[in-house]
Amino acid sequence: MAVHAHPDDEALWTGGLLAHLSRRGADVRVVTCTLGEQGEVIGEPMQGLIADEADMLGGFRYRELEDSLRILGVNGVHHRPCVLGGVGCWRDSGMVGTPSADHPRAFVKSGQQAVDALKALMSEFCPDIVVTYGPDGGYGHPDHIRAHEITHAAVAELPHTSAPELGGDNTDLFSAVLARRHGGRETSADHGIPDPVVLWAVRGETALKQAGRAISRIPDGWVAPSGMDFSFVDGAAGAVDSASSEKTPDKITEPDLAFVPDDLVDLAVQLSDADIEAQANAMAAHATQLWIADGRQSWTNPESAWAVSDPTVAPKVFALSNRIAQPLMREEHYVVAYGGSGPWAKTTPARYAYDSSVVRARGRSAFSLDQADEGAAHDTSEQSGQRR
């Protein structure tokens, strides 16, 4: 189960892992907490959907979410969105300090009701693994932080029956997921759920910077992220070294792209070409929010964009509405935050920070999911023909 704040987060933060596990036969559920009503819009045709005008962006993004879930192969055979509390229950709170956080349905005000709603979904689905963001929400968005809070609260409040064994090489973490559909476990809210492993989606510093340096040219009008030591080329403007001409080195306090130190990354999941393609297509389904620089167009955003990068390191380049160029990496990074049994178990939630008080997680361990689950008992998903 992946618990995400807005439509598009499932593809952007966890799309590679979700697509791969689905393709290999795991039952994958994405829970979306809001409809992203406060988002900006890429492309001129749909600008009128934003909250300050028609305020219809949430419904439009619901449809984009449907397409993304279908591409990733998750949320059952019909790939229907699972919106926490039901469609329209909670609203996008907007960025820090914006008036939208005062809306009576703002997700930051969801309280125990949101925890109870997530507990009900977990009791029904009985996940072995729960994926969300770290305590900072990945980049500080209030809804992402709230998703983290309710995820840990729900896991803590539900009764548990057992914990998946985590082997020293961490491959058993994903074997447990693939075995789940064959195990026939009977669980309920009364008897408890298997003690799930909680993962936080992050990006490790070295891999992100290496992928960024693999980009040699970005589209006209896009900008390079500040604080990352990248030097891209814009076909019209020449070298682009910063996300804003107003940002001089003495004004830059934080990088534009969020990352964590390498030693906080527990899992560096290597993605196949099929995983990357599924993730990129799922991201492109959110055309009002994400722009893939591979020439594709949509009726939402009819303007094409092209970037040049080393596909062995950064197979795609994308941007949000701010047009800051980012690499789509060949691996996804996760912190094992809580749960499980065996050598990798964590009985208290992990924490990460950028100061000496951080509770250090184990060092990075890269592996291929294809290799990790070769020969898994009853695993016939490679022959299932499931559509990507």
Curated annotation (Swiss-Prot):
GO BP field: mycothiol biosynthetic process
Record carries keyword Hydrolase: yes
Catalytic activities: 1D-myo-inositol 2-acetamido-2-deoxy-alpha-D-glucopyranoside + H2O = 1D-myo-inositol 2-amino-2-deoxy-alpha-D-glucopyranoside + acetate
Enzyme Commission no: 3.5.1.103
GO MF terms held by the record: N-acetylglucosaminylinositol deacetylase activity; zinc ion binding
Pfam family, one: PIG-L
Keywords linked to the UniProt accession: Hydrolase, Metal-binding, Zinc
Residues holding Zn(2+): H6, D9, H144
Gene3D superfamilies assigned: LmbE-like (3.40.50.10320)
Region spans: Disordered: 369-388
Designated name of the protein: 1D-myo-inositol 2-acetamido-2-deoxy-alpha-D-glucopyranoside deacetylase
Organism placement in taxonomy: Bacteria, Bacillati, Actinomycetota, Actinomycetes, Mycobacteriales
